[in-house]
Amino acid sequence: EVNLKEGESIIVSAGLEEKSPASFKRQFEALLDSRIPRDSFEHCLQNSAQQFIIREKEGTRMFAGFPWFGSCGRDTLLSIPGLVLTTGDKKTFKELLKYLTDTMKGPFFSNRYYQKSLYYTAVDSPLWFFLILQKYEEMLGVSKKTVWKEYGEVMSKILNSFIEGTDFNIKTLDNGLLYAGNENLALTWMNVFCEGKPYTPRTGLNIEINALWYNALRYAVEVLKEADKKNTDIEKWNEVANRVEA
């Protein structure tokens, strides 16, 4: 039995190893400071948002959904503005993009993380990357020069690979539009398979893919105009964008 006076507190600790009681209060207060209080609707939303962020030895990822969905490059990029940028969390933003860019295979982001293995079957994820950089600039106030310094190499790899042609029969046609896939692949968000065959392969010229493609080209040109006017890619990307527009 312990008698407490008004304003006093007591810490109860249970564990498998003996700890120094002198550090309990400091550890408790540090943990309390790191938590988001549930004292408003906004704070409750922030707390719910951070529950989808997973920090592991391999890097920082985002769950696509509970209970069984793992991380997905497409869903991560789609969710970053709402879950991360709205709170101004630049640290988590950069951690998420570092994991995605560190685990790229050619111009592709991993679209599925399952049993410690990565799968790369999405044509749109690399293009969503450009829209996320636009949101990064818009919502956190970074400059185009900063965007290019941090992510210019990845931007170039994606655009040039798609222009020259790459895996999954992805290629730029004479009219500038982006062609992707074959009858045995499902490279867009409509990627349900049955008996080894995609229900909706959507081979060819998908409207939302080409909208993202055009946006990526135009945004990259805007960034280069401010960050590196002497870069020869600016003419190539602008020429392809003009063909798409025509």
Region annotations inferred by a language model:
Residues 1-246:
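Acidic, mature catalytic/reactive cores of soluble proteins
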